[in-house]
Design a protein with these regions (language model features):
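Oligomerization/assembly interface segments of phage tail-like spikes and tubes
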Residues: 36-55, 165-187, 233-252, 371-397
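N-terminal low-complexity, intrinsically disordered "leader/linker" segments enriched in small/polar
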Residues: 6-70, 77, 242-248
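Autoprocessing Asn-cyclization modules and mimics
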Residues: 52-143, 188-190, 196-209, 253-343, ...
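Short solvent-exposed strand/turn elements
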Residues: 132-158, 164-185, 333-359, 384-393
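Low-complexity, acidic Ser/Thr/Pro-rich "mucin-like" tracts of secreted and single-pass surface proteins
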Residues: 232, 287-291, 297-299, 349-377, ...
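Polar/acidic, low-complexity leader/linker segments enriched in S/T/G and N/D
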Residues: 1-21, 182-214
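Conserved small-residue-rich
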Residues: 199-252
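Short linear interaction motifs
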Residues: 26-33, 157-161, 221-232
């Protein structure tokens, strides 16, 4: 059977959920040392959305699903929609548009539609190559397409499950649709814009506070319990591992493309990145003129300096950041303790310091990332993940 084009538009009241799934083998010792091996060249992608169809649209979709439910579909990437601002004449083989952040690929396909209905005029067109400002088509357009026509990148995909239709009456139905992209999913992993510290990138900006940020200090505990005596417990790593949730709400195609590049760099659980605590971990009581800063006594010096809690981000009020390692800490009084930092001297007035926060070398806790497209890529999305601390002294730092 030929590939069938999916023509039913999503119901955007619930958005479109895109899931990126990497596969990583994490070989962890009882001490927390890790070897991480990526098993996929690119992530598997799934798209999930709801539809609400009536009358002829419902009839057309149910006929298509009945006959081709197990086949490969030409699935429009709905979050990368583009509306033609002007007419395109028949015979042309170039479509001018901003392709950055849109899922076009050389040798791939695009879908042109002259409306939202399933019976609207549509055409599946081959792409020869992609530039930053347009698409070169494999053959000239056979028809004229007016301003307002809709253009989508297309991916070959399969339905992961048969749609379960909810029938509200004789002509109106809803269903939840889930596609899995059935081809390689390449994307740039360039994160050169991010700062670096000790050979690894640093995650910026901070988590979005539209919802509470969660965290914990995970221990690798081994318990022996014979059921009658006391339980014997061993902390095999003899240190905690930070677990830190992080949420982004990127707006616009540039922010979303940069965030996608970050996830492609991280490759699920494989690669490491420095992640800042969301807290003000110290309150300064002095400025800096050298490598020493005095802070309110937070009990840090009492426990000593240990891996995983010795690297500091100093954020200035202008938004710029300085990253340093704490090399010594001493208690000056009940109210003040002093931190000695490595690196070059720093000159800062106390009013120039916005926050002092720990940073921890982390990897993602999961290989799966959910990307909630609230609107198309020119608007708002929401993405959340959880980072897990690793033993930075054993990484290449």
């Amino acid at each position: 059977m030929n590939i069938i084009t999916w023509l039913a538009e999503p119901n955007w009241t619930g958005g479109v959920t895109e899931t990126l799934d990497w596969k990583t083998d994490v070989l962890q010792s009882p001490t927390g040392a890790e070897q991480r091996i990526a098993r996929r060249l690119s992530p598997r992608r799934t798209f999930e959305f709801s539809i609400l169809l009536a009358d002829n649209d419902r009839q057309r979709l149910e006929n298509a699903v009945f006959h081709a439910g197990a086949a490969r579909w030409a699935m429009p990437v709905f979050s990368d929609v583009y509306v033609l601002p002007e007419d395109i004449a028949a015979g042309g083989n170039i479509i001018t548009l901003d392709t950055v952040g849109r899922d076009f690929s050389a040798g791939g396909k695009l879908l042109l539609k002259d409306g939202l209905a399933m019976n609207a005029r549509s055409s599946l067109i081959d792409i020869e190559n992609v530039t930053s400002d347009g698409l070169n088509l494999s053959a000239p357009l056979a028809e004229r397409w007016p301003a307002g026509a809709i253009l989508y990148p297309v991916r070959h995909a399969v339905l992961t499950d048969p749609p379960d239709f909810t029938r509200y009456n004789t002509s109106l139905s809803a269903a939840q649709i889930r596609f899995r992209v059935d081809e390689h999913n390449a994307f740039s992993d360039d994160i050169a814009a991010l700062p670096r510290y000790r050979s690894h990138p640093i995650l910026e900006p901070d988590s979005n506070w539209s919802e509470s940020v969660t965290g914990q200090y995970l221990r690798l505990l081994l318990e022996l319990d014979n059921g009658s005596g006391l339980v014997a417990r061993t902390d095999t790593a003899r240190r905690p591992f930070v677990m830190q949730a992080h949420t982004w709400m990127p707006f616009g195609r540039d922010e979303q493309a940069a965030l996608r590049s970050l996830f492609y760099f991280l490759r699920g659980r494989q690669r490491a990145i420095w992640v800042s605590s969301p807290n003000h971990d110290f309150y300064p009581v002095s400025g800096m003129n050298g490598n020493v800063i005095d802070v309110e006594n937070a009990g840090f010096a009492d426990f000593g300096i240990v891996p995983g809690r010795r690297d500091l981000r100093i954020r200035r009020t202008d938004g710029s950041c300085i990253y340093r390692r704490i090399t010594a800490a001493t208690v000056l009084s009940e109210a003040v303790e002093r931190l000695l930092l490595d690196g070059s001297a720093i000159s800062l007035e106390i009013d120039d310091i916005e926050s002092l926060s720990f940073i921890t070398l982390c990897r993602q806790e999961s290989d799966s990332v959910e990307w909630q497209h609230t609107t198309d890529g020119d608007g708002l999305a929401s993405v959340s993940t959880t980072f897990r601390g690793i033993r930075d002294e054993l990484e290449s730092v």
